[in-house]
Curated annotation (Swiss-Prot):
InterPro entries: Aromatic_Lyase (IPR001106), Fumarase/histidase_N (IPR024083), HutH (IPR005921), L-Aspartase-like (IPR008948), Phe/His_NH3-lyase_AS (IPR022313). It comes from Streptococcus sanguinis (strain SK36). GO terms for cellular component: cytoplasm. This is Histidine ammonia-lyase. The gene is hutH. Pfam families: Lyase_aromatic. It catalyses: L-histidine = trans-urocanate + NH4(+). Its EC number is 4.3.1.3.
Amino acid sequence: MTHVINLDGEHLTLEDVIAVARHGATCEIDQEAKKAVEASRKIVDDIVREKRVVYGVTTGFGSLCNVSISPEDTTQLQENLIRTHSSGYGDPLPEDAVRAIMLIRINSLVKGYSGIRLSTVEKLLELLNKGVVPYIPEKGSLGASGDLAPLAHMVLPMLGLGRAYYQGQLLSGQEALDKAGIEKIALAAKEGLALINGTTVLTGIGALATYDAIQLLKLSDVAGALSMEVHNGITSPFEEDLHTIRPQSGQLATARNIRNLLEGSGNTTVATQQRVQDPYTLRCIPQIHGASKDSIAYVKTKVEIEINSVTDNPIITKEGHVISGGNFHGEPMAQPFDFLGIAISEIGNVSERRVERLVNSQLSKLPSFLVKHPGLNSGFMITQYACASLASENKVLSHPASVDSIPSCENQEDFVSMGTTAARKAAEILKNSRRIVATEIMAACQALDLKPENHELGKGTKPAYDLFRQHVRFIEFDKDIEIYEELNKASELIENEEFLAAVEKAVDLSIQF
């Protein structure tokens, strides 16, 4: 990919994060930003030379902030920080999450408030651009004082330590550098702290989940519209006049999306043609999906502020003042990421209920569990169970992490955000809900093929159905079928964005009005 993203600490977007994290876009540091980094570094060098007392530069860390460090030990202090703080647990974060983390950290550092050397920032950028991905365990951060443990793991390979992925192989940090043609570095005063003291890990994980949630919201409208086709849904609940008198942006956008998707459909009905009202899971799609759209639009705004923010401590102002504060505290993102998880969970919840309506013969008027010979075959019976399991798990995961705090560091850090847990939970809820929505689409397509009278599909539902059928076949449920294979195909189709792109060629879909 030839696209190069200019990093100035001010203009990074969520789409830029995705381009770097998932599509191999490279980055360069803005020329003015380089000057700001160098000016900030000069102030740190002056502090060390003048033996001034500044937290994390000439003192210990956390509750050890009153321990003075001699100028000759300031470099060792920083390496010790990385070695001792790299205490994460669990499985490694996905490579796209780590690349997002590296990018966001660089963008924060180039604002010029952290006192780091330009050469050190460029070293982290070199790892990113050349595809060296540090091995970062997923657990171990309190989300204050920043994401210390996981970010320490990010820094280890820069020193020739730790582990990293390169070209799909997990290697020692030094071996990864050697294969990529990168020289290791030694940290100078304040640099270890500048690299690890911030909300970067929780923001990186949450940024990817936010982007994926936006795509899922559009997919959920497609799924809901396909269910409407199956059930001969009543279209009046989506009329614009109904929603302009309650002008919630997400609700308005959802109603418009459904109208666009169903335009020209021969399957939809009007009130009293078959029944007076549809159930809430169809009739209230704008209100339910729309609420989640509004929540996620808010989270996106918070993410784009955070990826262009300084979350270091202490910070060094342009005038040379050193300020110890709390910008590393993850609470401003912990609450939004809890909110994100709840919003996504609701999409999974309502989609699972529509799956039940599709497979329930009393509700769909189709063969039980969408199979031609129910009894001999169980059809989609256990598929609905699986969706219910995922929806139920989401409800547990939706308990907010940000309401919890355990004091740490001898009670110096006595109130923490647990924001990284919130971000990780939101990402897991996203995976579960995406599976449920994929299953709804699969079940709706199966149901459409079983309908005795199936008329022309809508402007948006037809390309959705057509592309889906190119990848996932109608299931006869004979002895040759293993349904998990088709379920996996369905999930893979919507995860790679090809499915949504095909629908959006036909109709405009949005999350805000």
